[in-house]
Amino acid sequence: MSFRSVILRAWFSQRERSIDRFRRRPVETQERMFRRLLRRGRLTEFGDRYDLRHIRSVEQFQSQVETFDYETFKPYVERMMEGVRSVAYPGRVSLFARSSGTTSDRSKYIPVTMESLWWNHTLGMRDVATVFSANYPKSRVFEGKTLTLGGSCSREGRNLVGDLSALLIHETTFWSGWFRAPRTETAIIPDFDEKVEAICRECVGERITAFAGVPSWNLAMMRRVLEYTGKRNL
């Protein structure tokens, strides 16, 4: 077992007890998160408008806070993109995931906070890996790196805007390079073909044991890797 695998499995094992507690107490876990979200929401304009400070139950929340579609919530998003602080989240939000509009012609901008990236994506990936490691202790997937094929992002004023995958890659550079390939600079190249060529040059000598990203994108990349190396399989 490699040093990388030993360290990762030790990191995962610390999380197993928490995951087991979530399994055994799902309602309590959700109630605790509900209270946390209320505490955070009270510090915002949104919280003032809907009087989150005095909400004590899910039923009360449902009766006081209306249901939003994107167009209804859009004014909040626009003000956050203008740099206004504590609109719907405490402090300033400077990351925005851009989605292709499915209900209108224009793209939608989804506010993304560092707290959200950490709790939902970074720890979420850790939890998936923790469960996998516990169920398949003999797997060698952690012996190498995960090749992550994401989208791209760019600066729009003071904000960083782009695919959620690119925002996640961009904001987790300080630790993830140890078990993820390619380098961040390569991973967020805007042009797909250029990115794939750079990945071929950079990663064919790496020990890749897992792939992450859109399956069709990965399939196209794998085909190019086979052409690049002259191999018949990976």
What kind of feature is each model-predicted range?
Residues 1-98, 104-234:
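Nucleotide 5′-phosphate-binding alpha/beta core
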